[in-house]
UniProtKB/Swiss-Prot annotation:
Residues 347-414 form the S4 RNA-binding domain. It comes from Mycoplasma capricolum subsp. capricolum (strain California kid / ATCC 27343 / NCTC 10154). InterPro entries: aa-tRNA-synth_I_CS, aa-tRNA-synth_Ic, Rossmann-like_a/b/a_fold, S4_RNA-bd_sf, SYY-like_C, Tyr-tRNA-ligase, Tyr-tRNA-ligase_bac-type, Tyr-tRNA-ligase_bac_1. This is Tyrosine--tRNA ligase. The keyword Nucleotide-binding applies.
Length: 414
């Protein structure tokens, strides 16, 4: 049974702007296609893309046919919208490699999605045809009035990037005409590009068309910071770049306030289910009901049940200290997720702590040991003169070092 897609988006706090609400609902009733564009700027999507991926899936669950447009052509240029400077241009080989990787990721997350590549229809348009058939419909003052372009004019905007909005407008026109696609969704920075597409359709096909668009709020943390970055950089959807364990921990480490917002924006839990979680969490905050639900839902969504099971096993092993039961596969995941270094088996604990960068100096290492802040294989260590070879090794080659409550390191004993 279909629910009103706009009501669903509204209670979750997702909508930034809508061009025409009635057209969106008409498109839902007609089971039209909806599309979202992804430019292949890297060989993996990251958590910053999840807002749009999940919104595309929400539309799919409410009767729309989901289309992921991969920008094989526009990705060669780069979207200037609200960017501080021009992107470094990628080679065609880089773009093709990224397209293959991203398409595979998206297909795993949204199995019903259809893929289109705008290179298929943009690559063969000659410069003369572009100027006559597309450029003719865009007034210069109209483009300069777009906030996404106006913000870059002062710092410098190349003709290449200036043409981007026209290419994206043509994408919407092409899908509207050939794929029964009447709705485009995008991030809050895409309003100018989406409305350009609708205006182009109005100008070239029919003023009384059914094209419409929705922009989605930028996901920010409660302190105003941009969401999705950590001290070590982006959190990727590719498990070879960000392991399932790291991915799970990223969500688990969100604040209570951010967790509530993320459960609404990024999961498919109902309003009642989220309210029940909040109630449980308020009664027993130490059990982290909100964070556990968020981390589980997100890890399962991106890495399926198998990926979630791996993350939970590793999390439980770290918490309980039962590291000897870990499979080699899981310990390799831990190794990729945690700071690690090779250390000689005859090295003293105090020297190993400095080598592993657990402590910045021997003096600091002694302080940690004195305060019982160092655990090796889950045993509190106080003797700085113990040598690495005196410990039982996990799988005959590893030691797990823990500093305080949350910081883990791995020693590869040689």
């Amino acid at each position: 049974m279909k629910n009103n897609i706009l009501e669903e988006l509204k209670w979750r706090g997702l909508i930034k702007q809508v061009t025409n609400e009635q057209k969106i609902l008409d498109a839902q009733n007609s089971n039209d296609a909806v599309y979202c564009g992804f430019d292949p700027t890297a060989d993996s999507l990251h958590v910053g893309h999840l807002m749009m991926i999940i919104t595309l899936k929400r539309f799919a669950l409410q009767g729309f046919k989901p289309i992921a447009l991969i920008g094989g052509a526009t990705g060669m240029i780069g979207d200037p919208s609200f960017k501080a400077s021009e992107r470094v241009l990628q080679t065609k080989q880089q773009v093709d490699h990224n397209i293959n990787k991203i398409s595979t990721q998206l297909k795993e997350i949204i199995p019903t999605v259809s893929f289109v590549n705008n290179r298929d229809w943009l690559e063969d348009i000659s410069l003369i045809d572009f100027l006559r058939d597309i450029g003719k419909h865009f007034n210069l003052s109209y483009l300069l009035a777009k906030e996404s372009i106006a913000t870059r004019i002062q710092t410098g905007l190349s003709v290449t990037e200036f043409c981007y909005t026209m290419l994206q407008a043509f994408d919407f026109y092409y899908l509207y005409k050939n794929n029964d696609c009447s709705v485009q969704i995008g991030g809050s920075d895409q309003w100018g590009n989406i409305t350009s597409g609708i205006d182009f359709i109005s100008d070239t096909i029919n003023k009384n068309n059914k094209a419409s668009g929705v922009t989605i709020n930028l996901l920010t943390k409660s302190d105003g910071q941009k969401f999705g970055k950590t001290e070590s950089g982006a959190v990727w959807l590719d498990k070879t770049k960000t392991s399932e364990y790291e991915f799970y921990q990223f969500w688990f480490n969100q604040t209570d306030e951010d967790s509530i917002n993320l459960l609404k924006c990024l999961t498919f839990l109902t309003k009642d289910q989220i309210e029940q979680l909040i109630k449980q969490h308020n009664q027993q905050p130490a059990k982290h009901f909100l964070q556990k639900a968020l981390a589980s839902e997100m890890t399962k969504f991106v890495h399926q049940q198998q990926g979630l099971d791996k993350a939970l096993k590793l999390t439980e092993a770290f918490f309980s200290g039962d590291l000897f039961s870990l499979t080699d596969d899981l310990f390799k995941m831990a190794l990729n997720s945690l700071p690690n270094t090779q250390i000689n088996k005859d090295t003293k604990v105090i020297d190993a702590l400095v080598e592993l960068k657990v402590a910045s100096s021997k003096r600091e290492a002694r302080e940690f040991l004195k305060n019982k802040a160092i655990l090796i294989n889950n045993q509190v260590i106080e003797d700085e003169n113990l040598v690495i070879s005196s410990f039982d090794l996990i799988q005959n080659k590893y030691l797990l070092v823990k500093k305080g409550k949350k910081k883990y390191f791995v020693i590869l004993v040689k």
